[in-house]
From Swiss-Prot:
Pathway: Purine metabolism; IMP biosynthesis via de novo pathway; N(2)-formyl-N(1)-(5-phospho-D-ribosyl)glycinamide from N(1)-(5-phospho-D-ribosyl)glycinamide (formate route): step 1/1. InterPro entries: ATP-grasp, ATP-grasp_carboxylate-amine, ATP_grasp_subdomain_1, PreATP-grasp_dom_sf, PurT, PurT/PurK_preATP-grasp, PurT_C, Rudment_hybrid_motif. Residues 119-308 form the ATP-grasp domain. GO terms for biological process: 'de novo' IMP biosynthetic process. Involved in the de novo purine biosynthesis. Catalyzes the transfer of formate to 5-phospho-ribosyl-glycinamide (GAR), producing 5-phospho-ribosyl-N-formylglycinamide (FGAR). Formate is provided by PurU via hydrolysis of 10-formyl-tetrahydrofolate. It comes from Nitratidesulfovibrio vulgaris (strain ATCC 29579 / DSM 644 / CCUG 34227 / NCIMB 8303 / VKM B-1760 / Hildenborough). SUPFAM superfamilies: Glutathione synthetase ATP-binding domain-like (SSF56059), PreATP-grasp domain (SSF52440), Rudiment single hybrid motif (SSF51246). It catalyses: N(1)-(5-phospho-beta-D-ribosyl)glycinamide + formate + ATP = N(2)-formyl-N(1)-(5-phospho-beta-D-ribosyl)glycinamide + ADP + phosphate + H(+). Mg(2+) binds at residues 267, 279. Its EC number is 6.3.1.21. Keywords: ATP-binding, Ligase, Magnesium, Metal-binding, Nucleotide-binding, Purine biosynthesis. GO terms for molecular function: ATP binding; magnesium ion binding; phosphoribosylglycinamide formyltransferase 2 activity; phosphoribosylglycinamide formyltransferase activity. This is Formate-dependent phosphoribosylglycinamide formyltransferase. Belongs to the PurK/PurT family.
């Protein structure tokens, strides 16, 4: 893109965000720094990205007709999905009609559930993955466990943030894992994936940027998961040189198959110099929030540059860095944060509070960010900062 218009005028360069959570908010802010007009869409009002966007719409993004009506009215330069739960059939139609979907409508479709992307990675591209089977009924599920063996991981094919996910260690866990998967998926009861457990040393997110100038890899991000959801991340994760080369080759293959420009969060398991593909998101990744402090350009800045066709120069690491999630649990429609002063008292710390308007159950409300002399020091500092913040519900 050689030129950018002025927001709220006939020359505006407009992007439309589908999903307006914390990741969408950061994308919106980076786009607005470049003078881009931002329209935010989500299923609930006052979502984080809506609080900073030029305009917003509240609609179920699984309602294809409603989604089409908004897109046809807004006529965006590009449509930027931030979540998986979207009427991807409608996106495919709109792309065929000339609308641009980031990175592509096919990528949005394949990654909206675990089956599409696993079949692409393992069966079409031949990438190493854990053994797996898909099941639609309880009978198929039990047969899948028999084939894959114990221990194994059971997940709804459509879910996020660990919802519906269980580790099945013994036969006593089989019934409860099926029941949880049937209630925890985005589409309610439905199909599951049964994955063999990989005995890995660590897992990483390899942020991969496909842009007009080629492909750029961020340094690998290590992360800690609890109940299937991200709790901490750090960068750079030390890696064997052979493993890093394999990881980059896998990331290049899967993102190349998905196509388009933008940032992709490629999740991989690593043991020694062995690497297994796990999942990919064709958008900024929650573990990549650490790049708000770790790099000269965050994953959000990189995403916006890539989708606008702007240059992505050499990335610079600011030093060992870490993030730690700030959680709240309970019910509230007006959360308040305490201890912000204490959290920011240490040198080289920062907070990113998401501005989520409600809490019902457990919800990620922000992250603490820190630089340190090494990864352990950065992680400890980020944990201290996060621990200083309490959320009043």
């Amino acid at each position: 893109m050689a030129s950018i218009g002025t927001p709220l005028t006939p020359t505006a360069t407009r992007i439309l965000l589908l999903g307006s959570g914390e990741l969408g908010r950061e994308v919106a802010l980076e786009a607005m720094r470049l003078g881009v007009e931002v329209v935010a869409v989500d299923r609930y009002p006052n979502a984080p990205a809506m609080q900073v966007a030029h305009r917003s719409h509240v609609v179920s993004m699984l309602d294809g007709a409603a989604l089409r009506a908004i897109i046809e009215a807004e006529k965006p330069y590009c449509i930027v999905p931030e979540i998986e739960a979207i009427a991807t059939g409608t996106l495919l139609e709109l792309e065929q009609e000339g609308y641009r979907v980031v990175p592509t409508a096919r990528a949005a479709r394949l990654t909206m559930d675990r089956e599409g992307i696993r079949r692409l990675a393992a069966e079409e591209l031949g990438l190493p993955t854990s053994p797996y089977r898909f099941a639609s009924t309880e009978e198929e599920y039990r047969a899948a466990i028999e084939t894959v063996g114990l221990p194994c991981v059971v997940k709804p094919v459509m879910s996020s943030s660990g919802k519906g996910q269980s580790l099945v260690r013994t036969p006593a866990d089989i019934d409860s894992a099926w029941a949880y998967a049937q209630t925890g998926g985005r589409a309610g009861a439905g199909r599951v994936i049964v994955e063999g457990f990989v005995d890995f040393d660590y897992e990483i997110t390899l942020l991969t940027v496909r842009h007009a100038g080629g492909v750029t890899f961020c340094d690998p991000i290590g992360h800690l998961q609890k109940d299937g959801d991200y709790r901490e991340s750090w960068q750079p994760q030390p890696m064997d040189a052979v493993a890093l080369e394999k990881a980059r080759a896998m990331a290049d293959a899967v993102t190349g198959a998905l196509g388009g420009w933008g940032i992709f969060g490629v999740e991989l398991f690593v043991r020694g110099d062995e690497v297994w593909f796990s999942e990919v998101s064709p958008r900024p990744h929650d573990t990549g929030l650490v790049t708000l402090i770790s790099q000269n350009m965050s994953e959000f800045a990189l995403h916006v540059r890539a989708i606008l066709g702007l240059p992505v120069p050499l990335l610079r690491q600011n030093g060992p860095a870490a993030s730690c999630v700030i959680l709240a649990e309970g019910d509230s429609e007006a959360p308040r944060f305490h201890g912000v002063d204490a959290a920011l008292a240490e040198q080289d710390t920062a907070l990113c509070l998401f501005g989520k308007p409600e809490v019902h159950g457990r919800r990620r409300m922000g992250v603490a960010l820190a630089l340190g002399d090494d990864i352990d020091a950065a992680r400890a500092k980020a944990r201290r900062a996060a621990g200083s913040v309490t959320v009043e519900l």
